[in-house]
Amino acid sequence: MSRHQAVLQLHFFASILETLLKDVNHPLSHFDKVSEDELDELWSWNTPLQPELRFCMHEKVSERAALHPEKIAIDAWDGTLTYGQIEDYSDKLAKLLRLLDDSSNRIIPVLFEKSRWTSVAVLAIMKSGACFALLDPAQPEGRLRAVVQQVNAKIFLSSKAQSTLAARVAPAATIIPISKSKFNKIFSPYTAEQPNTTLPPVSPDQPLYIQFTSGSTGVPKGCILTHSQYTSGAIPRAAAVGYYPHSRVLDFASYAFDVCIDSMLCTLAHGATLCTPSDERRMNDMSGAMRDMRVTFAGMTPSVARTLDVDILNNLESIALGGEGVSISDAMSWGQRTRVVNAYGPSEATVGATINDNVAAKPYITMGQRKGCALWLTEPEDHNKLVPVGAVGELLIEGPIVGNGYLNNPSKTKEVFIEDPEFLIKGSKSYPGRHGRIYKTGDLVRFDPDGDGEPIFVGRQDQQVKLRGQRIELAEIEFNMQKHLPPDTQLAAEVIKPSGGGEQTLVAFLVEQKKNGMRHLDGNVFGSFTNKFQSALRDMTKQLFVDLPSYMVPSAYIPLWKMPLLVSCKTDRKRLREIGASVTRQDLRRFNSAVSEKKEATTEMELKLQSLWAKVLGGDADFSANDNFFSMGGDSLRAMRLVAAARDEAIVLSVPDIMLNPTLSAMAEKAKPVSAEETNEVPPFSMIGKDWDADAARRESARLCGVDAANVEDVYPCTPLQEGLIALSAKFQDAYVAQRVATLPAKTALRLKEAFDTAVEGSPVLRTRIVNVTGRGLFQVVLKDGQLVREHGTDTSEYLRRDRNEPMDLGTALFRYGLVKEPESDQMNFVITMHHAVYDGWSMPLVFDHVNSAFNGLHTERPTSFKHFIKHLTSLDPADAQQYWKKRLEGTSPHQFPPLPQKGYTTQADSLLEHYVTVPTSAHSKLTLATIIRGAWALVSSLYIGHPDIVFGETLTGRSAPVPGIEQIEGPMITTVPIRVRLSLDRPITEYLQMIHAVTVKQIPHEHLGLQNIRRLSKDARVACDLRTGLVLHPKEDEDWGKVSLETPANTFLPASDEEGAREALKFNTYALMLVCTLEENGFLVMASFDSNCISKEAMERVLVVLDRIVHAFLGNPESKLGDVAVLDPAEARDAEAMRPRDVMSDSALGMSPVDGLESMDASLKELSPNEEKLRNILGRILGMKETDIRPSDSFFDLGGDSIGAMRLVSDARAQGLNLTVAQVFQSRSLSDLAASASNEREDKLAEILSRILGIAKSDIKSSDSFFELGGDSIGAMRLVSDARAQGLSITVAQVFQSKSLAELASSAEEEMPSQPKTNVDAPFIALGKDANLHSPDRVGVYLENQEWEITNIYPTRPLQQLAVEGTVDLPRYSLRYELIKFATPIDRQKLEQACQELVARNEVLRTVFVKDNELTLGVVLSALRVPYTETAVPEGEDADAFIQAGIKQDIEAPKPYGSSFVAFNLFTHPNGASTLVFRISHAQYDEICLPILFEQLSALYSGTTVPETVPFSKHVNHVVLDNIPKAIPYWENLLSGSEMTVLKPTIPLTHRGPADIYREFDISSRPANITIGSLPTAAWALVLSRRLNLTDVVFGEVVSGRNVGAPNADRIFGPTWQYIPFRVPFSKSWSYLDLLRYVQDQHMTSAAYESMGFSEIVKNCTNWDEDKVQWFDTVVHQAPAWVEELPFGNGVEAKFQTLYPHGEPLREWKCQAFVKEGGRKLGIEIVTFEEWIGEAEGVLEEVGKALECLMEGRVGESIF
């Protein structure tokens, strides 16, 4: 640590200490990593920001040409050009370019070999105002073509030699070859004939060039740089580098790299000479070319600079190095001969962002000073957080040199070009923050700790690799190696996968610079080291172990004759990895022997491990103490075996120990003898949780198992696998139960039964049952007596039948056995039955080996039992695995192979195919066969499904966990994980397979999370876990490993061979396709079990042929690219196209054509109409979606819209001049349909109405169309009923939904004759009926606060309204709501008050006061009411929010008597001009549907715009009381006949009844078609109650709008129409989940017409329930409506809303509240209950989530029971 850094850290320490002394409770998380002093220093380095230069570089070149026209500007191999000539030629060419095309945003590719004409072409394009893209003809044609296609080239400049290539890569472009003869004969005469015009000035904001770099997808990324961005960096950069008028600058860099732009433009702008050698000399005789051209300044990579002759360096004024890290030894060596400059800069921020113009000034290399920019270092995972000085962070560049982003790639641009990170806006104590655009480089850098602010390069983020779980920075290794080796040594560290399999290995490739000696004349890439160099390597290795962790020390040093280089002259790391793949483990040992000092194993542990290595790896025990396990041929499987072998010798090792300490000596230090603690048993009941004591656990589990408590030996949690298997057993009852029969001699069978009895005593897993403990989940219960023996008999068939009918589920035995005597025979049938929850393919042989030992009188003692594995699982932090899988599966494609025939289809394997893939040993010895199979299958799936993102499941042994003796544990540990593979056909096969291997290794610590838990992590995880293909790899065991004797009777229950074991695994197939591969020495057998409805047998046969072909291609051509082998023959291609989902467009990376023609392209590609644009804007706002996520082809229903959202849409649309109805919204098939929306006697009338309210032409409505097919929903039906009644047709909402066609609806409609007498339901006082005289205005008037108020109407309050009145008058006043309307800008206070009073005048419920007369609560409507309106000033210096809330608290505590106004306004004015209007209202006057209308009215009244009209609430009351309730009583009587209220009441006592809630969101994006979102929570809740309470008939409450009862204009009623109504679900045994959804939806539709009755009215009039006992629902489902958060108030005034309920509502029931999220893609569920029951609620919410999963496509067709 430097002195400067130490002072900073000391200050930081003092600051932290001072804070903690003042506040010992100060959270550690609140401390910043960067101290205030450090932050000031960082800002001082970056302030002021260097200015933007607003001119173009070609202007500077023109100035030089005017001053020195005869001076040589370009001295090239193909001729020279003066400044006057380049000015003249570029002017003429620029004019020609403008004549050909003067449109804006032109991009012109430039394709030249090294030539004097390249600079002319570039200057001409600059002057013409176009943008250039430089290309190198040495690059592959495919890449050139990709670039040309991206820029949409219309004009293409090339040299004469490259014109043919240009025409090939750009066949549609105009090719203009450039040469001297072209200028003389064509360009000059042509421009002379044109009018004499001058070139217009070019804006500095115009794009100057596009620099293409490699893209991660294989498609080049084009970064756009403008003139000013380039100039702002080039001018200060050139001054620092050393461009002078006398300079002769080498034009070395390939035209594919942006350094060549600096070489051209900086040279010419400074009046220097550009020296351009031919490509041939540039690559093969650089020193000679520089010598001949008298070069004084050159820029190149350090790798190239090392090849220069010494005299060249002596004659250079400066050499600029970049593109790679510069070693201090190189800098010191070259610095003695010339000035060494180090440059750094990504293409995205022009050519160079920093320049170190004196690299020899320090004993280490820095990147130098900022040029045209500011530099920041942030945490690599969070660009908002700066890192301290000296710490490594990601480099961020800010300033005028930051480019515009990537061409046609907004997502990548957004990812790395960021705006206003938090640290930039925040600033520091001495420097104010600022806005800025920043580029994230991905480079890891640290600031020089000496305090001058210069950065030091560490490496690339993506050059960080992981080896055996440890992150390794290759650059750090190289840096530390270079320090201890001769300065001219070339080296590169890499992680390779040696030939012959095994783990990845860290090695170093080195080139020793020998002055004499033979070159590699034989073509061998490998070199040799001199004795002196070997000695240096040995010394270096010792120092590496001091400087670095052991896992960062290379396992071998590979000598090369020559370091492979890319065209950019950087080290070719891909080639190094290829060389590494050709090296065997024996080669590595040979390379190492030359430099390693063989250290004999001396310690006792080293000697023990030496023999264990020999046992596991084979061969003699001659390993030295510094030998590396993985270099010697070890891999993960052998590591597992080493752990087991060590355990046999009483040595404790874990797989991670081996991975991280691979040398014999390091491993020996890590190994330790088995301790007493490790051999002790895990105490019984030690893993059940502290809140569940052993006695309670024993009693509860015994009750659930139906046994005595004394019989319970232990209880511990289930594994995720067991949980999943038990859950799946409910779905596929027999799928995970195996029944096996062995026919044996009677004596043998009886002895075998005794052996089983003995083995069961010593094998707890066989005595294990699984139970579901309420509120706790699934647990394993180990019984002392498992009660496993079944009665004997003499009829085997009958025994097997009874055995199959005996369930294996919760609380029952999961393993059982019995004997059946064969009649008239000395044979007996021994039958065992076992559930997969207690065994797997690994543990089954262990169990039967246990039995065999007992059969032979031997005792078996397992070192570890299943509960040791459980202990390990419970010790893990699930958050780590959750984070891994969530990130791993982010963005997963929903398209998997094979596709299902239709949504909701339940797969059932019915076909089996076998195919043998022959793999010669010589071929697959270089690669892991398991990895090859995974990679090949991913490619096969991708080819067939037409998508590059593939997911399939793989079942693993699960025995990689660090549990001693895990290989001997009797119990199921297999685990299934989703394998995700993203393919790019540009990727080499070897690299692709290495990627797959790396992923499988990385997932090992997280493989036991469980599919059911992974799928809950996110929507993407759920998609990924809906697996269609399952893969099982059965490796062939070594003869000495895992061999089970076949001579004992228990082995008759084992599969006779690997093939039979594979077939056994196929019996448990629940996938559409399951592949079991049995791996052998010379190949593998594939057994495919599949559902022929998903893929035909013929097609599957061809799929296996494709798999075979790709495996062979992988083995035979590992250097090829995936695209070279990704080929289907015509028959295979037809299969693929036939089964490919129609919404999949084949990824361009897969090289396939689109599945459908252009006509299938989404309408989102079309330009939106004005109406579509308006509607998309409204939908985005009310559904909470990004507008860009809403396509014209999306329907409101698909986007997650509901009736409330539809009403908001209609209201907002009308405000924008679009006349829509709610019914039209639901009817529309798409946004386009809705935007384009504009009928025989009764049918004709209805068609006319439908045409109007659904917005479609009458001619488009057919008699056979049903309302539901036309898109209707409850609100739309309500409008149809209302409008039909106005036309004299009487229909109900139920009739609308029940009618299958328009014709049927018309036939059910009754015509109302005008002569029929009608009751005036709008008459005042009519709702009081015969009691009107008892509650006259004169009588009621005495109860009013003001006797002068004029009464216009009186009505009886509705039941919920009455409760709300009581909740306003009495304490606690839970029905009072305070809406805070916040104005940030000044408002017209007088106008606001007028608007508030006018609001009351317009809405009768606001001028309604409530009185109590003879125990009847009445609503009294006043003709006029001036409600309280006050203004309060917030005192200066007061916290406004606290002051307002104190005022609200004071207000709610004040009396609110009957007869007074519940409505009041208080305007709080703030000293800064802001204000807050507090609006008080009672729930007796509103519900959540009408309140947004009220605020729209208030906004309109204030701004003077059109005010939306509302319907008086008293009209609704009249309609309900006089018309609807009489009709509703028979309906509710019929629905609730024979029912009773369902009670979900835990046994936990309630003490203070405080409310508590929990909330989770669930993915519902795959909900079934034609099922409304509102049906989902209701159906899910019904399922939860049914399952939890074991009921088939449930009744609970549901909150409804109360607006579907047929009243006219129901959507505009202002008042509390909402109701709680009963919902009943009488389950049928034959129901599927879809049947349930349809039943729920049908009941919603039917009951909508009768939803105005209150609960108390229904109980009293429609049921035989006890009114005293059933006063309220026990559980209620409520779908919450959307809410207004902000609203414009006109004249630039914006209002934000905040809601306060100072007094919480007393909780009376369980509430299940649903919230539609993300436009209907997610459903939020909140469970509200009492605090004491919140633990129970967590289980309830979990069950709701599981129920919702069953209601989604893919499962909805399954049977419930």
From Swiss-Prot:
Pathway, per record: Siderophore biosynthesis
Region of interest called Condensation 1, as start-end residue ranges on this chain: 712-1135
A Pfam family that the UniProt record links to this protein: AMP-binding
One Gene Ontology MF term: ligase activity
SUPFAM superfamilies the UniProt entry points to: Acetyl-CoA synthetase-like, ACP-like, CoA-dependent acyltransferases
GO terms of biological process kind: amino acid activation for nonribosomal peptide biosynthetic process; secondary metabolite biosynthetic process
Disruption phenotype: Leads to increased sensitivity to oxidative stress and reduces the virulence toward rice plants.
Domain Carrier as annotated: residue spans: 600-675, 1169-1242, 1237-1313
Main EC class the enzyme belongs to: ligase
InterPro entries in alphabetical order: ACP-like_sf, AMP-bd_C_sf, AMP-binding_CS, AMP-dep_synth/lig_dom, ANL_N_sf, CAT-like_dom_sf, Condensatn, PKS_PP-bd
An annotated GO cellular component: cytoplasm
Residues the record lists as O-(pantetheine 4'-phosphoryl)serine modifications: S636, S1203, S1274
Domain notes: NRP synthetases are composed of discrete domains (adenylation (A), thiolation (T) or peptidyl carrier protein (PCP) and condensation (C) domains) which when grouped together are referred to as a single module. Each module is responsible for the recognition (via the A domain) and incorporation of a single amino acid into the growing peptide product. Thus, an NRP synthetase is generally composed of one or more modules and can terminate in a thioesterase domain (TE) that releases the newly synthesized peptide from the enzyme.
Name of the protein this chain belongs to: Nonribosomal peptide synthetase 6
Organism in which the protein naturally occurs: Cochliobolus miyabeanus
